[in-house]
């Protein structure tokens, strides 16, 4: 089999490339996906409120685990990644967050990445999006990804939590992806107007499937990329449960879109990576690139949970006897509790004036439960998910063998920087001050977690070590740039070889301030134009907020304990 392009991974980026490249009728594309189809009748992936279900099994989830994390009581921590058409957009929380404008301006300040500024990227965010309330300078109206905004009449806890954030002295913003990300406000979600998950399989692949120049093969586990000298020429993959070896060849390029965990694995198995690692595993060296699998970053988060004095939370939706009615309303009408991911409010703040853009993110949830559906509190409750955004901690990914079925060694090295501890202590104390504001007086009951007895630094640190969890945002493990640890250039081309690009969240040089899916899609849209030889979209001239000397907060309505200063 021979094609112009072979795309490895039908996830948030791979599906974008498949759809855009096949817009050229004379181009042939093979899309390889290790998982299966995105079954449209499977409520576990299609119902927004069921987002925890795919993380509980291995049908749609690679279910990676980290090595024992040394600063987290040596816990082996979850690292769920999507498996199937749609990749992680098939199992994520559906929060449509792009990151802060300053994230991209920081990227553009790095050598070789000058065209990755926010105003360079904004047109590609708009190109990908159809927002249900229409386009403007920041949002698109004709893109493949449906974005739904919160509606009047949604849960009152969303509004109370945003109001409490403002009463605590932080800004309000009406659009976390608009002029000003900083502040508290409504949160958009990747959900269709009919209440279905808007994965990239639904948005992009549905447009591309009818085209004769696109071939999609599922249950195709990539073994390695093939080379003739320094040029990528094809892909060796294993088909089906039997693992039958197959080979496909690329006339133009191989496009690796496996994500931040799989892409460095595949590169390393293919002979691209740290020379010592490859030599130890007897993998023939094609190109020594020490940065492959390094610079690994993620967002860590905690839940602060409270009982709710009024019966307005989503606790009844967790009871089995209420779920058939919820499911029927969603299935036939696309409405009701089932049609929302229930992350309809949140925010981004600076914990201190020293930060030039937000370093803390909030997701508000009108029920008390773990992200993966475990440990639900058996009463009315609500919670704030809170975590730091740009940790200095860096991890790594290393293959353990040549076997593509064997999971790699993953170490995020969470909380390895003193800054991490300062930020998380601040985050807990700030959250408590937010929850204590008058807007939540009608609802706020006792603190369930961490608990009112957890107060001093040592007590907070012990809670963080034992209870902080991944936000499922691995990234940056094949970073772009031109320094000695960079893996790809600003167009995704792997250094030192020809005919091979990496296009996914792994090429971010630094993790963004927020959820990753929207930015991963943008990256693929932007590089797709480069691959096709198209003129880049015109740079936006939209104005956007820069904090400058603006204080991180004003005086709160109700004071709580002061945040201790950094040493």
UniProtKB/Swiss-Prot annotation:
It catalyses: choline + A = betaine aldehyde + AH2; betaine aldehyde + NAD(+) + H2O = glycine betaine + NADH + 2 H(+). FAD binds at residues 4-33. One of its GO terms (biological process) is glycine betaine biosynthetic process from choline. Gene3D superfamilies: FAD/NAD(P)-binding domain, Glucose Oxidase, domain 3. Pathway: Amine and polyamine biosynthesis; betaine biosynthesis via choline pathway; betaine aldehyde from choline (cytochrome c reductase route): step 1/1. GO terms for cellular component: membrane. InterPro entries: BetA, FAD/NAD-bd_sf, GMC_OxRdtase, GMC_OxRdtase_N, GMC_OxRtase_C. The active site is at 473 (proton acceptor). GO terms for molecular function: betaine-aldehyde dehydrogenase (NAD+) activity; choline dehydrogenase activity; flavin adenine dinucleotide binding. Its cofactor is FAD. Its EC number is 1.1.99.1, 1.2.1.8. SUPFAM superfamilies: FAD-linked reductases, C-terminal domain, FAD/NAD(P)-binding domain. Keywords: FAD, Flavoprotein, NAD, Oxidoreductase. NCBIfam families: betA, PRK02106.1. PANTHER family: CHOLINE DEHYDROGENASE, MITOCHONDRIAL, GLUCOSE-METHANOL-CHOLINE GMC OXIDOREDUCTASE. Belongs to the GMC oxidoreductase family. HAMAP family: Choline_dehydrogen (MF_00750). Involved in the biosynthesis of the osmoprotectant glycine betaine. Catalyzes the oxidation of choline to betaine aldehyde and betaine aldehyde to glycine betaine at the same rate. This is Oxygen-dependent choline dehydrogenase. It comes from Yersinia pseudotuberculosis serotype O:1b (strain IP 31758).
């Amino acid at each position: 089999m021979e094609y112009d392009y072979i795309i490895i991974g039908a996830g948030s980026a791979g599906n974008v490339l498949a759809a855009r490249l096949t817009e050229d009728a004379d181009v042939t594309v093979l899309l390889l996906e290790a998982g299966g189809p995105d079954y449209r009748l499977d409520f576990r992936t299609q119902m927004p409120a069921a987002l925890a279900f795919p993380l509980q099994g291995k049908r749609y989830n690679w279910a990676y685990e980290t090595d024992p994390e040394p600063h987290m009581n040596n816990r082996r921590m979850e690292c769920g990644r999507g498996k199937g058409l749609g990749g992680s957009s098939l199992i994520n929380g559906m929060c449509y967050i792009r990151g802060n404008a300053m994230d991209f301006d920081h990227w553009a300040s790095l050598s070789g990445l000058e065209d990755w500024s926010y105003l360079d990227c904004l047109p590609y965010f708009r190109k990908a999006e159809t927002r249900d309330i229409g386009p403007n300078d920041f949002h698109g109206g004709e893109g493949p990804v449906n974005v739904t905004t919160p509606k009047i009449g949604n849960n009152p806890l969303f509004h109370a939590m945003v109001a409490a954030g403002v009463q605590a002295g932080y800004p309000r913003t009406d659009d976390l992806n608009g002029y000003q990300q900083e502040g508290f406000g409504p949160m958009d979600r990747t959900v269709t107007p009919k209440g279905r998950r808007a994965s990239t399989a639904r948005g992009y692949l549905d447009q591309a499937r009818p085209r004769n120049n696109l071939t999609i093969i599922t249950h195709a586990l990539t073994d390695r990329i093939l080379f003739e000298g320094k040029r990528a020429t094809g892909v060796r993959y294993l088909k089906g449960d039997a693992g039958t070896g197959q080979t496909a060849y690329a006339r133009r390029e191989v496009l690796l879109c496996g994500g931040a965990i799989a892409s460095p694995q595949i590169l390393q198995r293919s002979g691209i990576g740290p020379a010592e690692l490859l030599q130890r595993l007897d993998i023939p060296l094609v190109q020594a690139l020490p940065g492959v699998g390094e610079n690994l970053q993620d967002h860590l988060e905690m839940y602060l949970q409270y009982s709710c004095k009024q019966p307005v939370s989503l606790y009844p939706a967790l009871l089995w006897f209420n779920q058939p009615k919820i499911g029927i309303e969603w299935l036939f009408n696309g409405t009701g509790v089932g049609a929302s991911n229930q992350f309809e409010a949140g925010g981004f703040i600076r914990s201190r004036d020293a930060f030039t853009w937000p370093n803390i993110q909030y997701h508000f949830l009108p029920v008390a439960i773990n992200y993966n559906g475990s440990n639900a509190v058996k009463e009315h409750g609500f919670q704030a998910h809170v975590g730091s955004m740009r940790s200095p901690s860096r991890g790594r990914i290393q293959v353990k063998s040549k076997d593509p079925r064997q999971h790699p060694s993953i170490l995020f090295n969470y909380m390895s920087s003193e800054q991490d501890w300062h930020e998380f202590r601040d985050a807990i104390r700030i959250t408590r001050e937010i929850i204590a504001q008058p807007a939540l007086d009608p609802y706020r009951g006792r603190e369930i977690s961490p608990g009112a007895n957890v107060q001093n630094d040592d007590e907070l640190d012990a809670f963080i070590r034992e209870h902080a969890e991944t936000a499922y945002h691995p990234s940056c493990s094949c970073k772009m740039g031109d320094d000695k640890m960079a893996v790809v250039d600003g167009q995704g081309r792997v250094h030192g070889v020809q005919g091979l690009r990496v296009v996914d969240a792994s090429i971010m040089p630094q993790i963004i301030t927020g959820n990753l899916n929207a930015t991963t899609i943008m990256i693929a849209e932007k590089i797709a134009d480069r691959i096709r030889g198209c003129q880049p979209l015109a740079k936006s001239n939209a104005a956007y907020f820069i904090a400058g000397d603006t204080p991180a907060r004003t005086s709160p309505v109700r004071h709580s304990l002061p945040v201790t200063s950094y040493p």
